[in-house]
From Swiss-Prot:
Pfam families, A to Z: peroxidase (PF00141)
Site feature location: Transition state stabilizer: R101
Subunit record text: Homodimer or homotetramer.
Cystines in this chain: none
Entry protein name: Catalase-peroxidase 2
Family the entry assigns: Belongs to the peroxidase family. Peroxidase/catalase subfamily.
GO cellular component terms listed in the entry, alphabetical order: cytosol
Length: 738
């Protein structure tokens, strides 16, 4: 029988019906989160797995980047900058300002309270950042860079390329940058981040009745990088805008001088785009556009759709006469004119010189012979009206060299803040100077202790009289300050002995005041006995002491184990520690120690997942650590909640055995909110007390599944092995040298 191919019209119809059916089915799908919205979400612990990386688990980005000819890459970027493309022509024939905005917006979502955001990972490629209102048309900037990425492939990540393109742009326009470091690996999926709870773009429901911005958020409105350039919620009040600027830039770790340098330096270049009303001209964002758009969004149907018809923020104009050159014109214009409110062609509020002054100063970005007045945003006027900002801008205007250096350093900080210590930096353009915000630690300057030394040091620790729980709590306090989001904290540096960490409530300051001097004495006495230039740091002693305590706890439970230990940590000094910068690392909740303060912005169980995410733990690792730390009596302030064992200080699987024991009946405590009591079902006798974090391992189906593995008769050995492996992982999270 002869078979015929379907006609194109029939094929199109079948495709249309299939797509419609698929969309209907997808729209009707009901997820678990709909039925049980309060159920604890464990998905943050399962993101960024190696299986999602197309380069494979063995891919070594540092090695790949090391093979890169960085000079050649920069030359190629420089060529792209001045090669205008018909599909998206360059303003003033130069893509430099466009790429600066791309790099800035890639890095500028960094926030200090949880370390999320920043350029690492290249998250600007993914939703929601890819489609944020503040990132309009940056999809085109990355497409302009695709030939560079295509050429060099796995040798340079998108995360590094976007920042490097910003640096090269500055240099090509006459600015001397402070340096550049590679080392940002790419993510392959969107990061799960709390960007706010608003349901509409540019909505603002993130301030309390006092006007305080909710933590850990860094922007004033949903979909903005920092603040509304027209003023808070679109109200053109420069002083109110200054307050928002100070708050949001402060949440990005910038002080007033750095903030001024960034705004004034960045707005020296380029222009804003608001040739038409976005509501009438601009189409769907990249995520909402059809497949035929191939990932590009905001299609503009007005005029050419680009060039002099470009619509981005809705604001329109340039700040300086020479938008592709490093000059002092931004500050000169800010103070040289009296500024009055005006409206862009799109109807957005901006500022222009009064009485028509400067009407013909600024050349059009695309139309030869056409000129305009310079413009300012409300947030620019804030740099003149706010007393502190005015002092800084006035000083910079009088001292161009100081302004240039301040902008160079602030730009470097902006684009490198989430990379962690300088030891993670790659490439030939890394500046030699160590900066305080990099949390510097002295370089290893001595031979490390060997196996025999380690054994002798363990004996000294055990003979010190410090209890097992005290050693475990101290080591955990030192190492668990690490944040995988911005690679800060950790045991290296022994900053636990310095302010502010030694005074954090979660770290039991009174206990530290007793334990640390004893460990310091052990360190000093031991170093006196060493030969051959060998030394051991207090940072190493703290970690080794924790491991030694765990070995002792395991022996008490009938196990002979060795907790892995790699020496080589160093001790930071007070001069290398910015107290205010480290203050934001203070845990307001650490569920692994059953610690929760009123300042925690997450409920206990969610705080557990958040802390585990920061420690880059998997669900089994998190589970093993909680169970082990409970039986080791490692709760903050020696609290007994969740210590489900009659032998605290022994490493056993008792936490899971007793949690899963059906002879215990649990109920809420009638006297203490947030606590639970476990009673013997037969006698009614009180057995245990617990927090929601303790009980979540029996109530949450997925966590219970893991708890059952460790609570089974054949799960004892597995638990001990898994606990030690997870403990060692946490102790080494900041060991970027191994």
């Amino acid at each position: 029988m002869k078979r015929t191919l379907p006609t194109l019209s029939a094929l199109a119809l079948s495709m249309s019906l299939a797509l419609a059916a698929g969309q209907t089915q997808a729209a009707e799908t009901t997820t678990n989160s709909y039925w049980w919205p309060e159920q604890l979400d464990l998905s943050p612990l399962r993101q960024h797995g190696s299986e999602s990386n197309p380069y494979g688990a063995d891919y070594d980005y540092a090695k790949a980047f090391g093979s890169l000819d960085l000079v050649a890459v920069k030359a190629d970027i420089k060529t792209v900058l001045t090669t205008s493309q018909d599909w998206w022509p360059a303003d003033y024939g130069h893509y430099g300002p466009f790429f600066i905005r791309m790099a800035w917006h890639s890095a500028g979502v960094y926030r200090i309270f949880d370390g999320r955001g920043g350029a690492s990972g290249g998250q600007q490629r993914f939703e929601p950042l890819n489609s944020w209102p503040d990132n309009v048309n940056l999809d085109k900037a990355r497409r302009l860079l695709w030939p560079i990425k295509q050429k060099y492939g796995s040798k340079i990540s998108w995360a590094d390329l976007m920042v490097l393109a910003g640096n090269v742009s500055l240099e090509s326009m006459g600015f001397k940058t402070f340096g550049f470091a590679g080392g940002r690996t790419d993510d392959w999926e969107a990061e799960r981040v709390d960007w706010g709870h608003e349901k509409k773009w540019l909505d603002n429901k993130r301030h309390n009745e006092k006007g305080e911005l909710a933590k850990p958020l860094g922007a004033t409105q949903m979909g903005l990088i920092y603040v509304n350039p027209e003023g808070p919620n679109g109200v053109p009040d420069p002083l109110a805008a200054a307050r928002d600027i100070r708050e949001t830039f402060g949440r990005m770790a910038m002080n007033d001088e750095e903030t001024v340098a960034l705004i004034a330096g960045g707005h020296t270049f380029g222009k804003a785009h608001g040739a038409h009303d976005p509501a009438k001209c601009v189409g769907a964002d990249p995520a909402a556009a059809g497949v035929e758009a191939q990932g590009l969004g905001w299609k503009n149907k007005c005029g050419k759709g680009h060039s002099e018809d470009t619509v981005t923020s809705g604001l329109e104009g340039a700040w300086s006469v020479s938008p592709t050159q490093w000059t002092m014109q931004y500050l000169d214009n800010l103070y040289g004119f009296e500024w009055v409110q005006s409206k862009s062609p799109a109807g957005h509020i901006q500022w222009i010189p009064a009485n028509g002054a400067g009407d013909n100063l600024v050349p059009d970005a695309h139309v030869a012979g056409k000129r305009h007045a310079p413009i300012m945003f409300t947030t620019d006027i804030a740099l003149k009206e706010d007393p502190s900002y005015r002092e800084i801008t006035s000083r910079f205007r009088k001292d161009p060299k100081a302004f240039e250096l301040a902008f160079a350093k602030a730009w470097f900080k902006l684009t490198h803040r989430d990379m962690g210590p300088k030891t993670r930096y790659l490439g030939s353009d890394v500046p030699a100077e160590a900066l305080i915000w990099q949390d510097p630690i002295p370089a290893l300057d001595h031979a490390v202790i060997d196996t025999n030394d380690i054994a002798a040091l363990k004996s000294a620790i055990l003979a010190s009289g410090i209890a097992v729980p005290e050693l475990v709590r101290t080591a955990w306090a030192s190492a668990a300050s690490f944040r995988g989001t911005d690679m800060r904290g950790g045991a290296n540096g022994a900053r636990l002995r310095l302010e502010p960490q030694r005074s954090w409530e979660v770290n039991n300051p009174e206990e530290l005041a007793k334990v640390l001097p004893k460990l310091e004495k052990i360190q000093k006495d031991f170093n006196k006995s060493l030969k051959g230039g060998k030394k051991v740091s207090l940072a190493d002693v703290i970690v080794l002491a924790g491991g030694t305590a765990i070995e002792q706890a395991a022996r008490s439970a009938g196990y002979s184990v060795t907790v892995p230990f790699t020496p080589g940590r160093m001790d930071a000094t007070t001069a290398q520690t910015d107290v205010s910068s480290f203050a934001v690392l203070e845990p307001k909740a650490d569920a692994f120690r059953n610690f929760f303060s009123e300042e925690s912005y997450l409920p206990p169980a969610e705080a557990l997942v958040e802390k585990a995410t920061q420690l880059t733990l998997s669900v089994p690792e998190m589970t093993a650590l909680v169970g082990g730390l409970r039986v080791l009596d490692a709760n903050s302030n020696k609290a007994k909640h969740g210590v489900f064992t009659d032998k605290p200080g022994n490493l056993s699987n008792d936490f899971f055995v007793n949690l899963l024991d059906m002879s215990t009946r649990w109920e809420k405590s009638p006297r203490e909110a947030g606590l639970y009591q476990g009673f013997d079902r037969q006698s009614g006798k009180l057995r245990w007390t617990a927090t929601p974090v303790d009980l979540i391992f029996g109530s949450h189906a997925e966590l219970r599944a893991v708890a059952e593995v460790y609570g089974a008769n054949d799960g004892k050995d597995r638990f001990v092995e898994d606990f030690i492996a997870a403990w060692t992982k946490v102790m080494n999270l900041d060991r970027f040298d191994i």
